[in-house]
A protein has these predicted regions:
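FAD/FMN-dependent oxidoreductases across multiple families
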Residues: 118-184
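Conserved FAD-binding catalytic core of PHBH/FMO-like flavoproteins
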Residues: 44-135, 139-143
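Conserved N-terminal helical subregion
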Residues: 1-72
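Short coil/turn connectors at secondary-structure junctions
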Residues: 40, 104-105, 159
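Structured helix-beta-strand junction loops
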Residues: 18-19, 92, 159
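Active-site phosphate/pyrophosphate- and oxyanion-stabilizing loops and adjacent acidic/basic residues
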Residues: 10, 96, 150
Length: 184
């Protein structure tokens, strides 16, 4: 199944807040981090790459630029009752994925390493139509583009601080993959 990051995050947060053993802190004051070691928490889970904890303990990163661009869009199509099968095609330009969202919408991720094709949005939309075998497409929304990069933390934990999610593995534009890789 595919869900938006916000829906997933909100659902997870709601369930975690019901657990009396978990405390949430909305940290506005940077001094909070310097006092964190003195609080005696058994475990601290850090998912944020912008805070002092990450910068101090987890900023030793392995970075890679894949010299590719991922284009994403939503196709609007005729209703399909069981639109629940993702498809991926390995084209000579790069992988193209059709990821169902609803009965009438499907998300597209087309990772392109062909230097000439990266600049030709009309051709990209033509290729989406060409490889599409399931949908009667009514509309293809504007293409968004993201450079494909990897950022991997060389340290997964420090004492009682655990790096998690995108703070551990960040792969763009595959939103959420850092979290998925952590679960694996």
């Amino acid at each position: 199944y595919m869900t938006s990051y916000n829906n997933f995050f909100n659902s997870l947060e709601k369930k975690l807040k019901k657990n009396r053993l978990i405390k949430f802190k909305n940290i506005q004051n940077k001094e909070f981090y310097s006092k964190l070691d003195k609080k005696g928490y058994e475990i601290i889970i850090n998912t944020d790459t912008t805070n002092p904890l990450f910068k101090k303990y987890f900023s030793n990163l392995l970075n890679k630029n894949y010299d590719s661009i991922a284009f994403t869009t939503i196709i609007k199509h005729s209703k399909i009752e069981n639109n629940n099968i993702a498809e991926q095609f390995f084209t000579k330009y790069g992988p193209l994925a059709f990821l169902p969202i609803s009965k009438t919408k499907t998300s597209i991720v087309f990772s392109i390493f062909d230097k000439n094709l990266k600049k030709n949005r009309t051709k990209i939309k033509e290729l989406i139509r060409h490889y599409n075998k399931r949908y009667q497409i009514k509309d293809i929304t504007d293409l968004l583009e993201f450079p494909i990069n990897l950022s991997l933390s060389r340290n997964y934990y420090y004492k009682n601080i655990l790096s998690f999610g995108d703070a551990l593995h960040k792969i763009h534009p595959l939103a959420g993959q850092g979290f998925n890789m952590t679960l694996r």
